[in-house]
UniProtKB/Swiss-Prot annotation:
GO BP terms: proteasome-mediated ubiquitin-dependent protein catabolic process; protein ubiquitination
Domain of life (superkingdom): Eukaryota
Name of protein: Kelch-like protein 7
UniProt subcellular location: Nucleus; Cytoplasm
PROSITE patterns from the UniProt entry: BTB (PS50097)
Pfam families: BACK, BTB, Kelch_1, Kelch_KLHDC2_KLHL20_DRC7
Binding partners and assembly: Homodimer. Component of the BCR(KLHL7) E3 ubiquitin ligase complex, at least composed of CUL3 and KLHL7 and RBX1.
Organism: Rattus norvegicus (Rat)
Domain annotation BACK: ranges: 146-248
Length: 586
């Protein structure tokens, strides 16, 4: 039988691998013999003098491994003709290891020798060892050593290592500034660090805290630098409450007129209109926001069942939840607060319950002007939008309302093009998208496939391409320029199919279906992954959570993590950053 082309190609690859292994084995054997000759001082033509130790070697081997020795032995330098070559300011053990590496291509890098090895490899220009040390240190970077590693990398001209250390410093600044390494930095490095836009913080008060900690660590000697250091704090970004109660009361600030001016400037910023604030720059440029995203689920018909789901470790934690039960309500998250609105018991609930995730506190505000259930809600630019829904037992509504979180006031906006309830609504790139739903909560209420978008700038609605599948009680999430409609039900029953709306193309496309069919789906997205955390099938609820990777179009049923037990729950993504930290603000 003739051998196929694929088999021939595979055979050639195998033969090449075997030949390469044999060559490597022979080379290792030759070098092993040379290393033994070195140890026995056979044919050695140079002795490296390191303090009191004499290390024999062959010039050609050292020159091949090190650009430093190559230049030394091949130019007219004095050492090129000397049998003994003195290496000043070198450690004997480290030089011994580098010479051994030149013969064996093997070296042990560990936490005890890495700094000395890196210094020597850099000085004697042995790039493979330098790379091994850099790779080792990159894996060791943490809050306690990142500043020192950054300084070391700068001194030894290791840009890749410095970049890794600096990225860690910026991303974990709230941990780094509480370490001894930070307190011992010189003024130049602290000033540079506090000026970075890429510092990842919950709020600017943490940058202020870092500056004050550094100044107070050696107050008598650091007093002259106080204005330069505090000038890097962006006081307009600090809350008015923290400025007045904490910053102004700080003795360092009170005793320095220049610093007091900075604080007063920050206070004045809070008195400006949004338009006037936009004209300012520099001191009002935001830092990189620190995030800790979790998915919050509130019990709905079982209010005591409220939990966070952490997508990092797949853990569930309880949320203290005192409010009464609500059927068919909605919830959204904005600026540390979850807003729970709409829904009904026997009658529509007028009150809006609010939960501050950082302070773990509940309070109530006036709810939507038109109390109703089966509505949808989302947040954008400090405003909470509610759409559609139905007053108990009635048809779906065209209604569209807006709550301004700054003025704490409700406003009625232009109605939707289509009446709908039990629909989905998301914010994407500043626009409000509404998809699906039904014309009423009764059996005869037609399920919709229609979609529309609202532009807050022009206060106008525009009809969009309809979904492929009519659906209500579905999940609707926004991920990277795509809006995903997940499950739900049509006029015949539960759905397992999933489709997404391409915002740029104005078209819907089907993707892989869920490994479960549900008439009600409760899902949310963190990063590129959609998590289905609760749902109802008609005769039973979702048992374990489902995950959908939007980049690979793959579903995973996680059999190790139980789903949320309440199918009528409310769901939203929240940022809990700061919830478990020491609170600076009083």
């Amino acid at each position: 039988m003739a051998t196929s082309g694929v088999e021939k190609s595979s055979k050639k690859k195998t033969e090449k691998k075997l030949a390469a292994r044999e060559e490597a084995k022979l080379l290792a054997g030759f070098m092993g013999v040379m290393n033994n000759m070195r140890k026995q001082r056979t044919l050695c033509d140079v002795i490296l003098m390191v303090q009191e130790r004499k290390i024999p070697a062959h010039r050609v081997v050292l020159a091949a491994a090190s650009h430093f020795f190559n230049l030394m032995f091949t130019t007219n330098m004095l050492e090129s003709k000397s049998f003994e070559v003195e290496l000043k300011d070198a450690e004997p053990d480290i030089i011994e290891q580098l010479v051994e590496f030149a013969y064996t291509a093997r070296i042990s890098v560990n936490s005890n020798n890495v700094q000395s090895l890196l210094d020597a490899a850099n000085q004697y220009q042995i790039e493979p060892v330098k790379k091994m040390c850099v790779d080792f240190l990159k894996e060791q970077v943490d809050a306690s050593n990142c500043l020192g590693i950054s300084v070391l990398a700068e001194c030894l001209d290791c840009p890749e290592l410095k970049s890794t250390a600096d990225d860690f410093i910026h991303q974990h600044f709230t941990e780094v500034y509480k370490t001894d390494e930070f307190l011992q930095l010189d003024v130049k490095r602290v000033t540079h660090l506090l000026s970075q836009d890429t510092l990842t913080v919950r709020a600017e008060d943490q940058v202020y805290d870092a500056a004050v900690r550094w100044l107070k660590y050696d107050e008598p000697n650091r007093q002259p630098f106080m204005v330069d250091i505090l000038a890097k704090v962006r006081f307009p970004l600090i809350s008015k409450n923290f400025l007045s109660k904490t910053v102004q009361a700080e003795p360092l600030i009170q005793d320095n007129p220049e610093c007091l001016k900075m604080v007063i400037s920050g206070m004045r910023y809070h008195l400006l209109s949004p338009e006037d604030r936009e004209e300012l720059a520099g001191g009002t440029r935001p830092r990189r926001k620190k995030h800790d995203y979790r998915i919050a689920l509130f019990g709905g018909s079982q209010p005591q069942s409220c939990r966070y789901f952490n997508p990092k470790d797949y853990s569930w934690t309880d949320i203290r939840c005192p409010f009464e039960k609500r059927r068919d309500a909605a919830c959204v998250f904005w600026d540390n607060v979850v807003y729970i609105l709409g829904g009904s018991q026997l009658f529509p609930i007028k009150r809006m319950d609010c939960y501050n995730v950082v302070k773990d506190s509940w309070y109530s505000k006036l709810g939507p002007p038109t109390p109703r259930d089966s509505l949808a809600a989302c947040a954008a630019e400090g405003k909470i939008y509610t759409s559609g829904g139905s007053e108990v037992g009635n048809s779906a509504l065209y209604l569209f309302e807006c709550y301004d979180t700054r003025t704490e006031s409700w406003h009625t906006k232009p109605s939707m093009l289509t009446q709908r309830c039990s629909h989905g609504m998301v914010e994407a790139n500043g626009l409000i998208y509404v998809c699906g739903g039904s014309l009423g909560n009764n059996v005869s209420g037609r399920v919709l496939s229609s979609c529309e978008v609202y532009d807050p700038a022009t206060e106008t609605w525009t009809e969009l391409c309809s979904m492929i599948e009519p659906r209500k009680n579905h999940g609707l999430v926004f991920v990277k320029d795509k809006i995903f409609a997940v499950g739900g039900q049509n006029g015949l029953g539960g759905l397992d199919n999933v489709e997404y709306y391409d915002i740029k193309l104005n078209e819907w496309k089907m993707v892989s279906p869920m490994p479960w069919r549900g008439v009600t789906v409760k899902c949310a997205a963190v990063g590129s992954v959609i998590y289905v955390l609760a749902g109802f099938q008609g005769v039973g609820r979702l048992g374990h959570i489902l995950e959908y990777n939007t980049e690979t179009d793959k579903w995973v049923a996680n059999s190790k993590v139980r789903a949320f037990p309440v199918t009528s729950c409310l769901i939203c993504v929240v940022d809990t950053c700061g919830a478990n930290e020491e609170t600076l603000e009083t």
